[in-house]
A protein has these predicted regions:
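Surface-exposed, charged secondary-structure patches
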Residues: 40-79
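Primarily hydrophobic membrane-targeting regions of prokaryotic envelope proteins
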Residues: 7-16, 24-27, 66-88, 94
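Core segments of small alpha/beta cavity-forming domains
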Residues: 1-43
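Homeobox/homeodomain signature
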Residues: 4-5, 18, 44-49, 83, ...
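Solvent-exposed, non-transmembrane amphipathic alpha-helical segments
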Residues: 27, 31-34, 44, 48, ...
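Residue-identity detector for glycine
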Residues: 5, 18, 30-31, 49-50, ...
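Short beta-strand edge/turn micro-motifs at domain boundaries
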Residues: 81-113
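Solvent-exposed loop/turn segments at secondary-structure junctions
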Residues: 31, 74, 100-103
């Protein structure tokens, strides 16, 4: 199973609007259909600049999924964790659609379209 550093790196690529769409879609359970949601999240987080930092923590293999927390730190407000998970699709770990929606709604405050 992937470790926290690997999942953080994967999520950073997913949220990198400058990265190729195909590469980003490959790390999302929703594939290309989930990329617009990733764009919504990335564009909102980018408006905060360096104010918001985040990382994936405590991944635990749970059958065919990896449960983890996304820890989001904002100055003054502190750190809040959100439960997310990756699913095994074709031998690759991909961010689940429900987790993309958790990040969209609860972290970025934007629409989720998957």
């Amino acid at each position: 199973a992937p470790n926290a550093g690997e999942l953080t790196a994967d999520l950073r690529q997913v949220l990198d609007t400058g990265a190729p769409s195909d590469a980003r879609a490959a790390k999302l359970a929703g594939g290309q259909a989930a990329v617009p949601t990733a764009d919504n999240i990335a564009n909102r987080l980018n408006t905060y600049g360096g104010m918001v930092s985040w990382e994936v923590q405590n991944p635990v293999l749970n059958g065919d999924r990896v449960d983890a927390q996304l820890a989001v730190s904002i100055p003054i407000f502190g750190t809040k964790t959100h439960n997310i998970y990756w699913v095994d699709q074709d031998g690759q770990w991909k961010l689940s659609n429900p987790s993309a929606c958790v990040i969209a709604h609860d972290v970025a405050g934007v629409d989720c379209t998957v």
